[in-house]
Amino acid sequence: MSLVAIGINHKTATVDLREKVAFSPDKIHDAMKSLASRTRSGEAVIVSTCNRTELYCNNGDEADIIEWLEEYHGLDHQDVAPCLYNYHGQAAVRHLMRVASGLDSLILGEPQILGQVKQAFVKAKEAGTVALTIDRLFQNTFSVAKKVRTETEIGAAAVSVAFAAVSMAKHIFSSLSTTKVLLIGAGETIELVAKHLKDNGVASMVVANRTLERAQSMCEEFNATAITLAQIPDFLPKADIVISSTASPLPILGKGMVEKALKQRRHQPMLLVDIAVPRDIEPEVADLDDAFLYTVDDLHSIIEQNKASRKEAAEQAELITEEQSYLFMDWVRSLESVDSIREYRSQSMAIKDELVERALNKLAQGGDTEQVLIELANRLTNRLIHAPTQALTVASRQGDLNTLGQLRTALGLDKN
């Protein structure tokens, strides 16, 4: 067993590169099957969010996995390699546990990443790229993340990218209660944004989504108006704040659309926060007067303040993930010992079956019973002690007292 984790995140790469290596929801199923085919175990999970893309594989070659990632997205090695990080074995286990617990998030302790990791695991199971080791790894990880939440204050006054987006709006507008907000998307992040906006007194919200039914379902909770993406040009001029987070592979708001809306607003300022990867809003929008565009990479000041308040809780959480990653590796080693024992027993039984069959044939041919049994016992003894005898001889000749002592203990020669 050899667990490998390879990834890229907000710490190692810009949003430009992150969106190039992101996997869209409609393609991730086939992508995981393709990745799993490059491993010896057929096990792989891809975690792809706005802030990270990570590949978790069992019995995969690091160089081969990186090559697959570059080939899949059509990227040059020199552009991707400097931004990649990789972990093996226990380090890979701990990294996944840290990610799921929110310890590696843009906003320390944010809870949404756990749901995203769970969703990635479900998709991997649907793709048939999960077996014993990866299944146990992710199930343990979910338990560890829950343990971190219940035993530390990492989740106190929970924040997220959504919270940071709303916090930025509060810094720009003296009062959110009089602002009109357009939310694009209806996923978990936008739902959190809507919750934070409502908590801050926003009464006028419009939710635009590809499927109107999903937007309507969300709007019921927040007393908002649901529209389709095609209706955005009609509602954009009325919006003081636009926050977007969809899984669209192409931008939803272009410079021309925003420029037209600003003219209709008579150049009243508009705050646009794009927390999607790939980006929902064309970067050129930032060139427009009266348009203030921010992406996830612009939220660092809020995030740094959050990190300071959660440092102590994070230290406690780090100890939990370290301990639990060691416990998981103990299970892995026990699994490997079970395989070794099963193989050793199978080998011994095969020798026994071979020699017993030979003895029975001799008896059937009229051989002397006592002589056949003595010969069977001698041959069986010699075959079974052959490998241990060779190992003892090699250890003795090499002066390897440690191995020699372990062999003597294993063979029951040193009994205390």
UniProtKB/Swiss-Prot annotation:
Its EC number is 1.2.1.70. Pathway: Porphyrin-containing compound metabolism; protoporphyrin-IX biosynthesis; 5-aminolevulinate from L-glutamyl-tRNA(Glu): step 1/2. GO terms for biological process: protoporphyrinogen IX biosynthetic process from glutamate. NADP(+) binds at residues 185-190. InterPro entries: 4pyrrol_synth_GluRdtase, 4pyrrol_synth_GluRdtase_dimer, 4pyrrol_synth_GluRdtase_N, GluRdtase_CS, GluRdtase_dimer_dom_sf, GluRdtase_N_sf, NAD(P)-bd_dom_sf, Shikm_DH/Glu-tRNA_Rdtase. Substrate binds at residues 49-52, 105, 110-112, 116. It comes from the Bacteria. One of its GO terms (molecular function) is NADP binding. Possesses an unusual extended V-shaped dimeric structure with each monomer consisting of three distinct domains arranged along a curved 'spinal' alpha-helix. The N-terminal catalytic domain specifically recognizes the glutamate moiety of the substrate. The second domain is the NADPH-binding domain, and the third C-terminal domain is responsible for dimerization. Homodimer. Catalyzes the NADPH-dependent reduction of glutamyl-tRNA(Glu) to glutamate 1-semialdehyde (GSA). This is Glutamyl-tRNA reductase. The gene is hemA.
